[in-house]
Amino acid sequence: MTQTHPIHVFSEIGKLKKVMLHRPGKEIENLMPDYLERLLFDDIPFLEDAQKEHDAFAQALRNEGVEVLYLENLAAESLTNQEIREQFIDEYIGEANVRGRATKKAIRELLLNIKDNKELIEKTMAGIQKSELPEIPSSEKGLTDLVESNYPFAIDPMPNLYFTRDPFATIGNGVSLNHMFSETRNRETLYGKYIFTHHPEYGGKVPMVYEREETTRIEGGDELVLSKDVLAVGISQRTDAASIEKLLVNIFKQNLGFKKVLAFEFANNRKFMHLDTVFTMVDYDKFTIHPEIEGDLRVYSVTYENQDLHIEEEKGDLADLLAKNLGVEKVELIRCGGDNLVAAGREQWNDGSNTLTIAPGVVIVYNRNTITNAILESKGLKLIKINGSELVRGRGGPRCMSMPFEREDL
């Protein structure tokens, strides 16, 4: 926290001082094979090992002098009185689309009976199985209760929460509180709402450049802060162009200091779900990139003049474009998997491009992406390698699992 701003992020590579994570919890154990697609998962991580891997990730950050915050703690600290607590519970139930009146009442009573705030937050994250509620007489069941009688959950779990990068994004001194691609993940942004409204340190003290009530979608994996002057945003499977326009108008109007935005349009599919799964900044003049996006990639330059956005498609070489906008002589694009198409596909799927830079040239990576890691090391980068055999099953890497709150200026 700076003296005047609790959020301070003006680059992707400035020394990381403070970061928010979420330790995977019981929500992971509420994944079932029949409902993986509904919950945006491809597989079921083993929770015990996922927690060990995540704890090692957090410790690696602490070893580098980073203060680690946890989403579950910040959310719990935001429930500062009984009125806010009940408001949170009612909003949580409302957004879970619980339609049966008797079911709503039973869920509300269950949650109100949890007196510890952190336990309450973790329960809302884990979801609520129907077996946890008292039997509801048939005469009191709503149509939804009857139609979905075989579905085991009264409220779905939120297994994607350990990817803290997406529900909101820190941009300069502000925050984009996102409206997410799927209903499953959109509920996650409720925690950010309460943190930035009611938390003793952050509530009401951070300018909002996007609100979760918007109807168009945007996710934090598509929001990158390249420098104090330049942002990059992805037009992807999870983020649409209309959201980007709203975001950019707000950023420019809030006078956060940014002068230009580079909008990257690339393939719309799950393996390239966010810009940061195919493109991350690792040093002043170096980026990782997945070679498969390069052929179809289109880049637009966006500025704000006379109360309006000015958009122009950029032509030519991506490395030259980045160098020009970052004020460096030359930019090197380091290809995930090198020149081998098979290795590139495999290591991108396992988040070889999704690196977390904690200082210029110092990067946290999954140890499993051996080819990409060897290339990064050959370019002079210092790698901090973590095990992610279970964490990667959720299709996210170190950048996906972290939300910077404070970085040193470059």
From Swiss-Prot:
Pfam families: ADI. It is found in: Cytoplasm. It comes from the Bacteria. Gene3D superfamilies: Arginine deiminase, L-arginine/glycine Amidinotransferase, Chain A. One of its GO terms (cellular component) is cytoplasm. The active site is at C400 (amidino-cysteine intermediate). The keyword Repressor does not apply. Its EC number is 3.5.3.6. The keyword Cytoplasm applies. Keywords: Arginine metabolism, Cytoplasm, Hydrolase. GO terms for molecular function: arginine deiminase activity. Pathway: Amino-acid degradation; L-arginine degradation via ADI pathway; carbamoyl phosphate from L-arginine: step 1/2. SUPFAM superfamilies: Pentein. InterPro entries: Arg_deiminase (IPR003876). It catalyses: L-arginine + H2O = L-citrulline + NH4(+). Its main location: cytoplasm. One of its GO terms (biological process) is arginine deiminase pathway. Belongs to the arginine deiminase family. This is Arginine deiminase. The gene is arcA.
